[in-house]
Structures are given as C-alpha cells and as structure tokens.
C-alpha cells in the first residue's frame, strides 16, 4: 500500500483533476467512457462487468467519477500483491520469496500499462485468487473450498470479460499441471479432483444461464459482437514483447518506443507492455534448473516420501519433487504465453497455428489476446521468487551475491517515475486554464467531435463545446460573429494547422489571444461584423496550404446568413477561382434576382451585392452553370470529388 501511495502521490494530490497512468498511446476514450458510466445511476447492460462497474459507481457516490476511477485502479495494486502473496505461500514459497513475487506481479509492466486505460483489465488480483481457490479445492474439496472456488470463479469473470476468458482457457492446463505436480499425491486425490471438476461444471452452467437471461444475443449470434480477425494480429503479443523494456520505464522507455516504432507497432503498443524483465527470466530459469537438478538427484535411490512427509521406504520418489511448484508454474506460463500470441505465423514456408486462431471462431468478441500476459507475469514472478530464494539460501557467497544483484536488477527493470504516472484528465493546459477562471466561460474547442474528444464537454461541465456539423471550421473567415451569436465567449485551438493561421489572422477575425500554452491557445471573441454565416451546405471540408485556406464547392451550395439588425446595403467580397476552367456562378439571395459572376481559373476577389438584408436569417445560394468536374478526371490525383469553385477568404461591408 505504501509503495502504491508513493507512486500515485501526484494523482492523490488532485484525484478529481488527474488520472493515474502513463499516456502510452495518447488520449484514448476508454478511461473517460468508464468515468461517465460511474457518474450515471448504477445499472447493468450488455457490456457491464458488474463487479468492477458497481464498485466504481459506489465509490463515485462519495468521491466523484474521476476520483472513483483512480481509487478503483490504485486499490488493484495492493490487492494484487496480497492475492499473489497468498498464492505463493500456498505453493510453499518462503515469506521473502512470496513477498518478492507479490511485488513483481502487482507492479508488473502489464499492470501499470493497463491501469492507465483499462480499469477492468487492471483488476489483476482476481487471477491469482482464482488459481489459489482452484488448487486449494484440488487439495481438499471441502464445502468451504468449493464455495470459495465458486466465488472466485464468479469474481474473475464478473470483474472483466478477459479475466473470464483467461480463466476458462487456462483452467484445464492449471488442473492438469497441479494434478501431476502435486494433487495426485494427496489423500483421496481422485475424489478431490472429481468434486473440483463437478463444482466447476456447476459454476459454468450457472454462468451460461446468467448470460442467457441477461444477454441471450451473445449465445445466439456471437458474430454480432465480433471483431475483425485482423485485429488479433494487432492486439496480440509478439514473443519478443516479453523481453522489450516497458515504454514507461524512466531510462529505457525511449529505447522501447524506438523499437516499437521500427516494428511499425502503434495502435497495439499498449497491449505489447508485457515485459517480464531479463533478471526475472534469469531467476525463473535458475528455479527451473534447480528443480530439474533436484528431480534428477532424487528420482532414484532415496526413500519414498508421502505428502504427509513420512518415509515409505527406499525406491523411486512418489511425492512431489521440491520445490514442487516449479513445473506447475512453468507449464501454466508456457501455455499462457502461447495463448497471448497472434493466431498464426509463417516460418520457413510453414504456417503455424496458435490457440487464438482456434478461440476466435468460438469467442469472436475477444481480440486482445496479449492480456494472457497477465498470467505469464504472475507465473514468472513466482518462479523468480523461487529462484531468488534458492540463490540467497545457498552457502556460496558468490551465489548469494548474484541472487541479491538479480533482485536489485529486477526492481530496477520494473521501476517507474511517479511524475510520469500522472496526467491531467483534461487534454491540454488550455482546458485546465478555462476551468480555473473565476467567471464561467463558454468556450468553443476546434477539435472535431470523436470518441476520444467526446468526454471534454462532460469533464468541463459544459464550459467547452467541440466542433460539430454546425460549427466545424475554425479557419472560416469572420468566425467570431458566428460563435458569438451561438453564445460562445472564447475560442480554443489545439496544436493543429489552424493554430498558426488564427495567430496570423486574429485581429482581423475578431479574436484576441488571452492565454498561450505549449499545446493550445485560448482566444477571446470580440466580433467585428453584424453579418455572420450560421450554416454552410454543399462545400467540401476546408483545405489549407501555407497561409491560405479555402473550401471547394460542388455544383450547388448555400450559406445561411444572419444579421441581428436590418442592413439595407451589404456587399460580400470573396476570393474565388474556378476549377480547371472558367465558369459562370449564379448567386441568389432568398427569392431575389440572380447575380451572375464569370469566375476565372485564377484566384481573385469578386463582389456580390449590394444585398438588402432584413433582421434575421437569409439563404444565399450558389449555382454552377457548368456541371462540377471530378478532380481525378482532370488531374489524375485519385480525388473523386466533384468540384466547381474554390472559396477562400471573404469580408462583409456596408455601403
């Protein structure tokens, strides 16, 4: 717990303004979607993961949704350590070895990375608890052990979907490995196994019944929720991912990013954070070699030993060879590693199929098979604890020194910098500045409305609104009047091409810089014009080159213009040029007479009007006398848009 508090200190100082975790793959929408779920009344739906969702919603009632997200994630670290420690002690690790394994698992790169984006996947404590309940039940299937197994199975499944998948796939391997490594030597072993399997079967039937009742579509038509098979290659681990340093590492993170960039891994980089560390690999290898040597020495010629420790007489050893956990852990780790890989790989002309290829037709709604790496991390940590204990328990000083050095190196490989594990819940410093102003502002954010940006309005309590189909062009001439009429007092532009454009045209466009930050600017709106454009139709999205920007028009287009007061003589001056050849442009205000302009292929300013405007909205229509031309037909650039005229800067003036 103390280690968690130290790592999360920057977040704990402002738990409702900052969130835990390094921003490995940018501002993804997942954490903010979960926060919004916590803010709503508690409910269950198709995508609910009840144990995590209801816990987060309950915490949010007292702390708020952002802080609830942080607490839910942070609590998973000490809980994962406790669960791993209990499992380690059950497997007969010494207290020191169990503590090392618990810390390595709790603060593994996988857990730290997932905690930044996926609070459900970060609930890794349920995996070791499930294995503990399973293996304890195989030792002695008492009523309480069966009840604990049922509860652990429900917890690992209802905490997150991937936990249920991992448990379901690896349970047969975990049972087989534990049976051959230990359980078969216990009293009434076959009976204990039968009771355990029966309990699991009953829990599985109950789970299917629950899904059938709450979301029958999942069973009837699994393809309705399926991901594309190609996603499995992006979100599955590479075998060498387990050896690459985590990108959040304070010293080696830059090297890791360069490795992933050279391998063209971008979208799936988060799922590749499954590094176990070279020192952990070495310690685990020492544990395996130590077990193999002990097994070889004791296989013949020593007294047979029962599970209760009594000597049964000379001959081959029939009890588990100590430390008995090593082959169990190695077997589960190996299968989990293979399950975490992509569906197939071709080597030397031969295509090798992997478990994810077999699982995809059965459960096509899963794609991030790299998350099996959580079990690899757990098994590797336990093996490392055993290996470290073996080295530190030897009488040879050199071996003890190597053991201590490897433990220190493991800590260094898993090290993170607390400041890098904290980020603002808002996307830029400009957004934070807006929220710090004493007077409530109404700010227009030029960022398009996407899944990643949709949370901004909610997080700012409605102070900041994003670009939409009505307001989608921050480089539009005389934008200030339009935004002012819509109730906005400020304009926020992030670090895009629009930022330098607005800096250059601020005064002329009726905006003035109020706050400048490295990642965004905030402008106050002071409109210069009484005529503004409320809506635009028939134009393609704005383009830009250098200091100029424009929008291409199709064959017909329109502006909805608004003036709060009557304007008897208004002139519109607009920079235009025709596409490819000169064209005639007809312009009409409402139902009035047409004005025809002969627009050349070279850009220049044209005057429309004078126009007589009454107070209120008016429709200004544009019509190309010649049909719009497909760009690709003329300049063979692959552009299939139909173009007629380009409209650049414009200006209204009164006479």
PLM ranges: what are they?
Residues 176, 182, 276-306, 310-323, ...:
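Hydrophobic, aromatic-rich transmembrane alpha-helices
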């Amino acid at each position: 717990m103390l280690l968690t508090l130290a790592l999360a200190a920057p977040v704990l100082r402002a738990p409702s303004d900052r969130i835990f975790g390094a921003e490995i793959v940018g501002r993804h929408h997942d954490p903010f979607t979960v926060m919004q779920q916590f803010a709503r009344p508690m409910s269950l739906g198709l995508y609910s993961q009840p144990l995590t969702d209801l816990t987060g919603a309950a915490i949010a009632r007292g702390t708020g949704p952002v802080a609830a997200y942080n607490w839910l994630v942070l609590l998973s670290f000490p809980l994962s350590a406790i669960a791993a420690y209990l499992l380690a002690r059950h497997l007969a690790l010494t207290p020191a070895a169990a503590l090392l394994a618990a810390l390595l698992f709790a603060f593994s790169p996988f857990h730290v990375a997932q905690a930044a984006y996926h609070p459900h996947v970060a609930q890794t404590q349920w995996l070791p608890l499930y294995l503990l309940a399973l293996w304890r039940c195989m030792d002695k299937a008492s009523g309480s052990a069966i009840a604990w197994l049922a509860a652990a199975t429900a917890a690992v499944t209802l905490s997150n979907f991937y936990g249920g998948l991992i448990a379901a796939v690896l349970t047969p391997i975990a049972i087989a490995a534990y049976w051959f490594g230990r359980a078969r030597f216990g009293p009434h072993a076959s009976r204990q196994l039968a009771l355990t399997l029966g309990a699991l079967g009953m829990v599985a039937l109950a789970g299917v019944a629950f899904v059938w009742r709450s979301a029958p579509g999942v069973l009837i038509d699994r393809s309705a929720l399926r991901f594309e098979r190609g996603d499995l290659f992006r979100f599955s681990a590479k075998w060498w991912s387990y050896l690459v340093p985590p990108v959040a590492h304070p010293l080696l993170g830059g090297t890791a990013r360069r490795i992933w960039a050279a391998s063209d891994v971008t979208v799936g980089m988060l799922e590749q954070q499954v590094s176990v560390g070279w020192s952990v690999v070495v310690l685990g290898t020492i544990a395996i070699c130590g077990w193999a040597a002990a097994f070889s020495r004791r296989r013949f010629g020593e007294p047979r030993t029962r599970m209760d420790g009594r000597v049964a007489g000379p001959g081959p050893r029939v009890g588990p060879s100590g430390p008995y956990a090593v082959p169990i852990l190695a077997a589960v780790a190996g299968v989990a590693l293979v399950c975490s890989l992509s569906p197939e790989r071709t080597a030397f002309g031969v295509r090798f199929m992997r478990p994810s290829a077999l699982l995809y037709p059965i459960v096509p709604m899963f794609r991030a098979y790299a998350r099996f790496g959580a079990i690899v991390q757990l098994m590797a940590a336990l093996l490392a604890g055993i290996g470290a204990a073996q080295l530190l328990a030897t009488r040879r000083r050199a071996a003890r020194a190597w053991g201590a050095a490897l433990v220190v190196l493991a800590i260094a490989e898993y090290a993170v910098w607390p400041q890098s594990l904290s980020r603002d819940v808002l996307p830029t410093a400009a957004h934070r500045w807006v929220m710090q102003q004493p007077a409530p502002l109404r700010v227009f954010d030029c960022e398009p409305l996407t899944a990643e940006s949709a949370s901004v309005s909610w997080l700012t309590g409605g102070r900041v609104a994003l670009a939409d189909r009505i307001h989608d062009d921050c480089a539009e001439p005389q934008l200030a009047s339009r935004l002012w009429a819509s109730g906005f007092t400020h304009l926020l532009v992030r670090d895009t091409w629009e930022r330098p454009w607005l800096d250059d045209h601020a005064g002329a466009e009726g905006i003035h810089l109020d706050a400048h930050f490295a990642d965004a600017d905030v402008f106050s709106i002071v409109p210069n014009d009484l005529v503004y454009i409320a809506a635009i139709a028939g134009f393609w999205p704005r383009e830009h080159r250098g200091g100029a920007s424009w929008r291409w028009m199709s064959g017909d287009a329109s502006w909805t213009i608004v003036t709060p007061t009557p304007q008897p003589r208004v002139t519109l001056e607009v920079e235009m040029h025709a596409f490819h050849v000169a064209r005639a442009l007809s312009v009409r205000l409402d139902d009035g007479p047409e004005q025809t302009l002969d627009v050349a292929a070279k850009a220049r300013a044209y005057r429309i009007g004078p126009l007589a405007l009454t107070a209120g909205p008016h429709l200004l229509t544009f019509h190309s006398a010649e049909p719009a031309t497909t760009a690709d037909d003329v300049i063979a650039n692959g552009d299939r848009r139909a173009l007629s005229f380009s409209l650049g800067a414009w200006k209204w003036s009164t006479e």
